[in-house]
Every structure is written in C-alpha cells, then in structure tokens.
Swiss-Prot record:
Positions with a binding annotation for D-glyceraldehyde 3-phosphate: R166
Catalytic function, reaction form: aldehydo-D-ribose 5-phosphate + D-glyceraldehyde 3-phosphate + L-glutamine = pyridoxal 5'-phosphate + L-glutamate + phosphate + 3 H2O + H(+)
Pathway: Cofactor biosynthesis; pyridoxal 5'-phosphate biosynthesis
GO molecular function: pyridoxal 5'-phosphate synthase (glutamine hydrolysing) activity
Organism: Bacillus cereus (strain Q1)
Name listed for the protein in its UniProt record: Pyridoxal 5'-phosphate synthase subunit PdxS
Keyword flag Chaperone: no
UniProt entry tagged with the keyword Manganese: no
Domain of life: Bacteria
Annotated active site: K82
Protein purpose: Catalyzes the formation of pyridoxal 5'-phosphate from ribose 5-phosphate (RBP), glyceraldehyde 3-phosphate (G3P) and ammonia. The ammonia is provided by the PdxT subunit. Can also use ribulose 5-phosphate and dihydroxyacetone phosphate as substrates, resulting from enzyme-catalyzed isomerization of RBP and G3P, respectively.
Residue ranges the record marks as coiled coil: none
Keywords annotated in UniProt: Lyase, Pyridoxal phosphate, Schiff base
Length: 295
C-alpha cells in the first residue's frame, strides 16, 4: 500500500474537513475548552491574541511549545499554531510537536522579508493569508493547503477581510473567463504562477479552501463573510477580547452555520455584552498594517 501521508491530496483533504466551521485563537487550555464546547472545528494555539500582539508591539514569535502542548492535551479537535513567515526552524519545531496545521502568519513578525516557506517540504498542512489572487496562487504553488483572508488582525474591524474576500472572488471569476492564450499574460501581470491559474480556471474556484480572517468580531460579521463566499471563519481576538467569550463563541459558531437565517442571527446577537474594542483602519500607520507583511 502506498504511503500518502503528507501528500498534497491528503493535506488539502484535511483542510477541506474544516469547511463551514469556525477556528478560534486560544492562549491556554481553559480557552481551548471553551472553544471546543462552543463548537469550534479547530483552535489556534498562541501566546497572545492579535489584539494583544498589536498593543504590545516589538517582535512577535512562535508560541512557547509548552502552551501548544497544553492546548493539544486539553481538546480533541485539531490544533493549529503560528510560525513566522519564512522561519524554517519554527515550522519544524511545530511539526515535531505534532500540531495538526501550521499557519505561516503575518500576525507574527516576519523572519524573512524575501522568501516564504516551501510548504511542500513538510508533512503537516499549512494555512496562509492572502489579499488577492496573486498572493493566493503563490501560496498554493508553495504548498499551502488552506488559505484565509489577511484582513487586519486584532482590529475587530471587518472591512479589510471583506475587501480581500471580494477581491479574490472577483479575480477568480476573471480568470475563469480568460482564454488560454490570455492566461500567461495575466500570470505575468499578477505574479500568479501559470499552472495554479490553469487549475483555478479549470475548477472555477481556488483548489484549496479559503476562510475569512482578520476582523471578525460579531455573529453578523461571521455570517457576512460566509455570504461573501468564505469556506469558514477564523476568529482571533473577537472571542476572548469580548465581554462574554463563551456566549460570543457559541453565537459566532451558530451564525457561521446558519448565515442566511436572519431571525436566528438577530436572536444570537441579543444580550451578548460588548464586542471587542475596534480600531478604525485609517488610524493605523503603514508599519502597523499586518496585512502588508509577506508578498
């Protein structure tokens, strides 16, 4: 029997299993249990949620392996963890710990401003952020098994995630309409690898799932992103920076599943308490915009 562990097909299939669900950032076992009980399909283990990373400034790195192992031991759902863009060793360390997915994340301070990881070299599937089809196709060519919008992490402001989801989906429609002889020029102009564009054109969609991330703070935000075509939702700071994390977690999971049931979403939104404090994007300096990290 052929061993297919870690092949592109297997890794993409693992990511596909999370479709329609919510993945929540957690910093300890207690939060991980709250996420699992609320119905999260996976958790992201890290030292600080994006809002705290943004507030603290400085250099943000991979979480202490003790935190990752604590979370892995507390829940039965898949556990993800973040490494810095281009940091070969952080990725290998996380793989050695046995995490289910690695997020090569712009939320952390990049280790390499030129190269992303060759994700095909790893057995574990990778998640990466994207703002447009060029970024999406490059990450897929490198071996990403799951994509997510970059949005603007830690802001509680959905506007950038909306922009990125609409941009990617509009460009998918454009690629699907191109003639074969036009595809190479489009690849040149966008920096998108030609073979990935051919696959997108053939499928009429990305060949991997694309989740919403970066600014989801309410049940309505989650439902909005699903309506715009997201395959699922990442919630970073929106759960555990809210007034009532357990309530927000359950409500966001329900709203993601029933994203066209407006009466239910209205009911879910009642009595939740305050959502996380938001940040207006225009107030951020260029160097504070995490979405600009990577290429």
């Amino acid at each position: 029997m052929t061993n297919v562990t870690g092949t592109e097909r297997v890794k993409r299939g693992m990511a596909e299993m999370q479709k329609g669900g919510v993945i929540m950032d957690v910093i300890n076992a207690e939060q991980a249990k709250i996420a699992e009980e609320a119905g999260a399909v996976a958790v992201m283990a890290l030292e600080r949620v994006p809002a705290d990373i943004r507030a603290a400034g400085g250099v943000s790195r991979m979480a202490d392996p003790t935190i990752v192992e604590e979370v892995m031991g507390a829940v039965s759902i898949p556990v993800m963890a973040k490494c810095r863009i281009g940091h070969l060793v952080e990725a290998r360390v996380l793989e050695s710990l046995g995490v289910d997915y690695i997020d090569e994340s712009e939320v952390l301070t990049p280790a390499d401003e030129v190269y992303h990881l060759n994700k095909r070299d790893y057995t574990v599937p990778f998640v990466c952020g994207c703002r447009d089809i060029g970024e999406a196709a490059r990450r897929i060519a490198e071996g990403a098994s799951m994509l997510r919008t970059k949005g603007e992490p830690g802001t509680g402001n959905i506007v950038e995630a909306v922009r990125h989801m609409r941009q990617v989906n509009a460009e998918i429609r454009q690629v699907a309409s191109l003639r074969e002889d036009e595809l190479m020029t489009y690849a040149k102009n966008t920096g998108a690898p030609y073979e990935v564009l051919r696959e997108i054109k053939r499928l009429g969609r990305l060949p991997v799932v694309n989740f919403a991330a970066g600014g989801v703070a309410t049940p309505a935000d989650a439902a909005l992103m699903m309506q715009l075509g997201a395959d699922g939702v990442f919630v970073g700071s929106g759960i555990f920076k809210s007034e009532n994390p357990a309530k927000f977690a359950r409500a966001i999971v329900e709203a993601t599943t029933h994203y066209e049931d407006y009466e239910l979403i209205a009911s879910l939104s009642k009595g939740l308490g305050n959502a996380m404090k938001g940040i207006e994007i225009s107030t951020l300096l260029p160097e504070q915009r995490m979405q600009e990290r990577g290429w």
